[in-house]
């Protein structure tokens, strides 16, 4: 990377041009004017990055386009590790679930966990991949303190699955639309350990609990063009592994980790630009923001004639500064010196084995979205219901008990979702059952209770459980649908509010809502609102 030094004549001030931006190092106390100039330079640099970020987000007005691919590591929810019988549980005491095999002791031999192969085939099929009937393991060799063997067991030239794709629907707030992103390969490998750094930074410790834990790496084609598309791709993969039950997909626990490759090129150019890998993104929102920043950084360098400063490297996303920083220069495949793993045989799969797994596959998110869409639900409803497998199951079960699809979706997306958000609960943690939600919807639809009373009953059922019928009976909540009874209440309210009635006659017709509210109050919310408005309208018209 080019380095330009600018030295002041009297004061040893060193200014460095890095990535097209000025950074100033003060070697001795300066006069305030030099400090002001340095701050102004930094402010101008920060402003230029912000402007470039905004421009990059509006790709249509740019002369550059981004090319984005993602490598996703999914930690499998197997009982034991990939090549030994050690269990793994997130948060365990450091180095408490290890053995000579996963610690890399001499003379130990790996034994493949058959469940890892099953999970790999499941995910490969879900990603519409070609499953290899014969694949093999390889040694990926590199040195790092958390890699006890000095190599990682992975798959190199013959992965277990390849040439697939992932379909998804973008959220409505991001423009909507269907997308299909290619999947280059899915391969099996083992995880490394973890370094624990001291607060002072003076030393690090190694926890090998995670060493040997099975992973699936999913490599996408460079088909994405925006941070939003990449984030939604990652979110769809998370949904997929959760639907399949192969992983919990929790990014906070490291069960799903995304490394993003980003490059930019002039629109219309077929050759790829120099790609940069970004790590350390712990949420899908962070993925989107990191990519948008990196796109803006690279476009800025191109516009300033410094494209040669974009080098193949690994950069870390820093959440506090909302920027990426150089971590290391990117290694090439030759640096890993791959060669076949001599201690493991080839993985040979029969067509019967693959078919058996195919036939046991659950309904996947894409198929579920299309089914919900065919029910006449809006795309917003479809995405909300299908994005969480537990919510989708609750919705389907409610329909099985006879509820109308649109009404059930409205209740789940409205009052139930609001309660879950406020209480920080998932839908499988509440006491309301799909049967009782369908009963509640039916009770409102047939006029037994009003919608207002229905909301009150819903909250009680969510928090305490029980049945709709018992709550209605215990609290005497049956809707008043007798016209004579409602008429009597309307007459009483009009008689009790002569001043408002006179104002209504003078043209303040909005007071009809006031009278309706008073009747509902007198009936404790049980008056049939349709019948009430009809009778009230007739009475007010007669009194005008």
Swiss-Prot record:
> From its record, what is one biological process in GO terms?
mitochondrial translation
The protein's matches in SUPFAM superfamilies, at most eight in alphabetical order, are given as:
GatB/YqeY motif, Glutamine synthetase/guanido kinase
Q: Does the keyword ATP-binding apply?
A: yes
Known EC number: 6.3.5.-
Instruction: List the PROSITE patterns hit by this protein, alphabetically.
Output: GATB (PS01234)
Entry GO terms, CC: chloroplast; glutamyl-tRNA(Gln) amidotransferase complex; mitochondrion
Q: Where in the cell is it found?
A: Mitochondrion; Plastid, Chloroplast
Which top class of enzyme applies to this chain? ligase
Catalytic activity from the UniProt record: L-glutamyl-tRNA(Gln) + L-glutamine + ATP + H2O = L-glutaminyl-tRNA(Gln) + L-glutamate + ADP + phosphate + H(+)
- What domain of life? Eukaryota
UniProt GO MF annotations: ATP binding; glutaminyl-tRNA synthase (glutamine-hydrolyzing) activity
Q: What family is it from?
A: Belongs to the GatB/GatE family. GatB subfamily.
Function field: Allows the formation of correctly charged Gln-tRNA(Gln) through the transamidation of misacylated Glu-tRNA(Gln) in chloroplasts and mitochondria. The reaction takes place in the presence of glutamine and ATP through an activated gamma-phospho-Glu-tRNA(Gln).
Q: Relate the assembly described in the record.
A: Subunit of the heterotrimeric GatCAB amidotransferase (AdT) complex, composed of A, B and C subunits.
Miscellaneous note, as given in the UniProt record, is: This protein may be expected to contain an N-terminal transit peptide but none has been predicted.
Q: Which protein is depicted?
A: Glutamyl-tRNA(Gln) amidotransferase subunit B, chloroplastic/mitochondrial
Q: Which species?
A: Oryza sativa subsp. indica
Q: Its gene?
A: GATB
């Amino acid at each position: 990377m080019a380095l330009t030094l600018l030295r002041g004549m009297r004061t040893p001030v060193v200014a460095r041009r890095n990535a097209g931006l000025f950074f100033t190092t003060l070697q001795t106390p300066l006069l305030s004017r030099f400090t002001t100039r340095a701050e102004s330079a930094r402010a101008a640099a920060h402003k230029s990055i912000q402007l470039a970020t905004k421009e990059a987000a509006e790709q249509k007005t740019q002369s550059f386009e981004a090319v984005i691919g993602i490598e996703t590591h999914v930690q499998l929810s197997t009982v034991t590790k990939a090549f030994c019988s050690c269990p793994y549980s997130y948060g365990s005491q450091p180095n408490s679930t290890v053995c000579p095999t996963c610690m890399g002791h001499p003379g130990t031999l790996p034994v493949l966990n058959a469940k890892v192969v099953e999970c790999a085939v499941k995910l490969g099929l879900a990603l519409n991949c070609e499953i290899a009937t014969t694949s093999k393991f390889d040694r990926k060799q590199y040195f790092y303190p958390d890699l006890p063997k000095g190599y990682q067991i992975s798959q190199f030239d013959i992965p277990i699955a390849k040439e697939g794709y992932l379909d998804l629907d973008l959220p409505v707030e991001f423009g909507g639309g269907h997308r299909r992103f290619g999947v280059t390969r899915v391969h099996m490998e083992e995880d490394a350990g973890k370094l624990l750094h001291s607060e002072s930074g003076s030393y690090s410790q190694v926890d090998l609990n995670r060493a040997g834990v099975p992973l699936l790496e999913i490599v996408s084609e460079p088909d994405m063009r925006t941070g939003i598309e990449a984030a939604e791709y990652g979110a769809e993969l998370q949904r997929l592994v959760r639907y399949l039950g192969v992983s919990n997909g929790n990014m906070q626990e490291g069960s799903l980790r995304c490394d993003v490759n980003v490059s930019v090129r002039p629109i219309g150019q077929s050759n790829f630009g120099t790609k940069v890998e970004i790590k350390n993104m712990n949420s899908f929102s962070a993925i989107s923001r990191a990519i948008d920043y990196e796109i803006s950084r690279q476009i800025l360098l191109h516009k300033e004639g410094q494209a040669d400063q974009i080098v193949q490297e690994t950069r870390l996303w820093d959440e506090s500064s909302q920027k990426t920083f150089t971590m290391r220069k990117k290694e090439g495949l030759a640096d890993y010196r791959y060669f076949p793993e001599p201690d493991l045989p080839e993985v040979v799969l029969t067509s019967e084995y693959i078919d058996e797994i195919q036939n046991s596959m659950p309904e996947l998110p894409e198929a579920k979205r299309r089914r919900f869409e065919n029910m006449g639900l809006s795309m917003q409803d479809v995405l909300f219901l299908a994005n969480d497998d537990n919510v989708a199951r609750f919705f389907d079960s409610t329909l099985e008990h006879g509820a109308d699809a649109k009404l059930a979706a409205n209740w789940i997306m409205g009052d139930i979702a609001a309660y879950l958000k406020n209480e920080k609960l998932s839908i499988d943690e509440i006491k309301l059952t799909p049967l009782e939600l369908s009963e509640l919807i039916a009770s409102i639809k047939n006029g037994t209770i009003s919608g207002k009373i229905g909301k009150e009953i819903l909250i009680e059922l969510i928090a305490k459980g029980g049945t709709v019928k018992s709550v209605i009976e215990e609290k005497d909540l049956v809707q008043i649908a007798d016209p004579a009874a409602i008429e009597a209440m309307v007459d009483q309210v009009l008689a009790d509010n002569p001043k408002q009635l006179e104002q209504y006659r003078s043209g303040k017709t909005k007071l009809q809502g006031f009278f309706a509210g008073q009747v509902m109050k007198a009936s404790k919310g049980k008056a049939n609102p349709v019948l009430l408005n009809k009778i009230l309208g007739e009475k007010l018209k007669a009194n005008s």
